A protein has these predicted regions:
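Extended, Lys/Arg-enriched charged tracts that mediate electrostatic binding to polyanionic substrates
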Residues: 168, 172-175, 180-221
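The feature captures two recurrent sequence modes
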Residues: 1-188
Length: 221
């Protein structure tokens, strides 16, 4: 069975193709990226050895994630397929509705980018450390896997508003601005003000917004 990105791509509904990126592994990640990955993962492994759920450390290996190198999406899919899941790479934040639909399909969306050395301890934008090492290992836990899938089934049916869309776009813009090394403090300030303005215009919490909060409180944290 092939786990190439092209094969996985064809299994995804066409309207979601616009959000899928291509992981050209050898061209996209350089030696510095690999060094950052090793540093972050070794620190994480040391910190979580005694505090993480036992499933997590076992799940790293079971989902194709190594401490020594950035994971290849093909290698991850070979492992995830045994758990009934797949993974694709995406370019940063994608709309919550698209994210939930992928989750309903048991497809894990993983950010393509690798954080920079300047943002080695924390990155404001989604990156492959957070998306792969942060979420994939827990899929090895059957109850968590069922929960995540069910969340997607419910989330894809949730009603959302125009305000939700505007907040998402402002949040994505801010994360992009913070991710650019050349972005000025003034540009970040403007992006933050733009997001706050959109948040202040929200007059009602939609089903989608409430589910997003629950997702942050359970899946993200």
């Amino acid at each position: 069975m092939s786990f190439s990105q092209e094969v996985i791509f064809k299994k995804i509904p066409k309207h979601l193709h616009q959000f899928i990126a291509n992981q050209d592994y050898d061209l996209y990640y350089n030696a510095r990226d690999q060094a950052v990955w090793r540093y972050v993962m070794r620190q994480l492994s040391h910190q979580l050895k005694s505090s993480a759920h036992p499933i997590y450390n076992e799940g790293l290996e079971k989902t194709g994630i190594s401490i020594e190198k950035i994971p290849s999406i093909e290698e991850m899919n070979k492992c995830l397929s045994k758990l009934g899941w797949m993974a694709i790479v995406v370019d940063g934040f994608i709309p919550p509705q698209a994210f939930m639909e992928l989750q309903e399909l048991k497809v894990l969306a993983i950010a393509l980018d690798m954080r920079s050395i300047e943002q080695i301890l924390y990155t404001p934008a989604p990156d492959i450390v957070h998306e792969s090492a942060g979420h994939a290992p827990m899929l090895y836990d059957t109850e968590y896997s069922v929960y995540l899938h069910r969340f997607g089934e419910i989330g894809v049916k949730a009603m959302f508003t125009k305000q939700d869309k505007e907040v998402y776009e402002a949040m994505r813009h801010l994360s992009i601005m913070k991710g650019y090394p050349s972005t000025t403090k003034e540009e970040i300030k403007q992006a933050e003000e733009g997001l706050n303005n959109k948040l202040n215009t929200v007059t009602i919490l939609s089903e989608s917004a409430l589910l997003t909060r629950l997702h942050w409180w359970t899946v993200e944290y």
